[in-house]
Curated annotation (Swiss-Prot):
GO terms for cellular component: cell cortex; cytoskeleton; filopodium; glial cell projection; internode region of axon; myelin sheath; neuronal cell body; paranode region of axon. Binds actin. It is found in: Cytoplasm, Cytoskeleton. This is Ermin. GO terms for molecular function: actin filament binding. It comes from Bos taurus (Bovine). The modification Phosphoserine is found at S72, S225, S229, S232. Keywords: Actin-binding, Cytoplasm, Cytoskeleton, Phosphoprotein. The modification Phosphothreonine is found at T236. Residues 264-282 are annotated as: Binds actin. Pfam families: Ermin (PF20491).
């Protein structure tokens, strides 16, 4: 048996292909030059463990270079065109997420676990806060919960006080508006009553003037009657007509109506009262 080191560019041994760049030590086993069976030579390949790790390192270095290039390009774009900031940020996030997914797939294929690239500082802060909360003892957590509940209770009380004050203000405004409305209605009623009273006074004054003129005409006619008929007997003072009494009666009726019915005149029945007054005088 002789061991001979041989280098192959592309050699298939037991169905496996060695890498293009790497050189492996191959031991060729021959049992003898004068072998009768003529069996082909058996190859044994010694695998190298450094090859997959070198590939993974190269891929990770390429990813880091791509990230640095994309970040530098984004900074240049932001300096040149600040209005495209949102678009660039969104694009950078999508690129990072795609690269992260590619790294995960590579790790699954190669059987190695790679560290994930953090997307932003906010995620790191959130994770740190969660770690701090988990590290805090239970007593501190309970104290913080009690403080939060107390703050919520004070906020609820303050909001309730504000609502009650607003309700009180609305009620007071409604009461004031109702009082003003009632005063306006009362003033309107008083004005209507005054107008009705003025109308009744005018009508009564006209009626009084008509009665006075009628009395004067009747007195003049009575004075002219004995002169026109000399044969007629003179009228004694006992038989004189009681025009004064009639006038007094009408005046008394007017004063009585003025004291009793005049005060009862209200809006809506003025015409009826005037008709009653005219019927009573006539």
């Amino acid at each position: 048996m002789t061991d001979v080191p041989v280098t192959f560019s592309q050699v298939e041994c037991n169905g496996d292909t060695p890498p293009e760049n790497g050189q492996q030590k191959i031991t060729k086993i021959t049992e003898g030059a004068s072998d009768v069976d003529g069996t082909p030579p058996h190859c044994r390949v010694e695998p190298r463990l450094d090859v997959p790790t070198e590939r993974n390192q190269e891929k990770s270095e390429k990813l880091q270079e791509d990230i640095l290039l994309s970040s530098s390009m984004d900074e240049k774009i932001l300096k040149e065109k600040p209005e495209e900031k949102l678009y660039v940020v969104h694009k950078a996030l999508t690129d990072l997420s795609l690269q992260e997914a590619a790294v995960d797939k590579m790790a699954l294929r190669e059987g190695h676990q790679w560290e994930k690239i953090p997307l932003s500082s906010s995620n790191q802060e959130i994770s740190r806060q969660k770690e701090r909360i988990s590290e805090q003892p239970l007593e501190e957590r309970e104290d913080e919960e009690l403080e939060n509940t107390a703050l919520q209770a004070t906020e609820i009380e303050w909001l309730g006080f504000q609502k009650s004050s607003q309700v009180d203000l609305s009620h007071s405004k409604q009461d004031e508006e109702q009082e003003v409305w009632d005063e306006e209605i009362n003033n309107d009623d008083d004005d209507d009553c005054k107008d009705d009273e003025d109308e009744v006074r005018v009508i009564e004054f006209k009626k009084k003037n008509e009665e006075d003129t009628q009395l004067k005409e009747e007195g003049d006619a009575s004075e002219d009657s004995p002169l026109s008929s000399p044969s007629s007997q003179p009228v004694t003072p006992d038989e004189q007509p009681t025009f004064g009494k009639k006038g007094d009666f009408s005046r008394n009726a007017y004063s009585r109506y003025n004291t009793i019915s005049y005060r009862k005149i209200r809006k809506g029945n003025t015409k009826q009262r005037i008709d009653e007054f005219e019927s009573m005088i006539n």
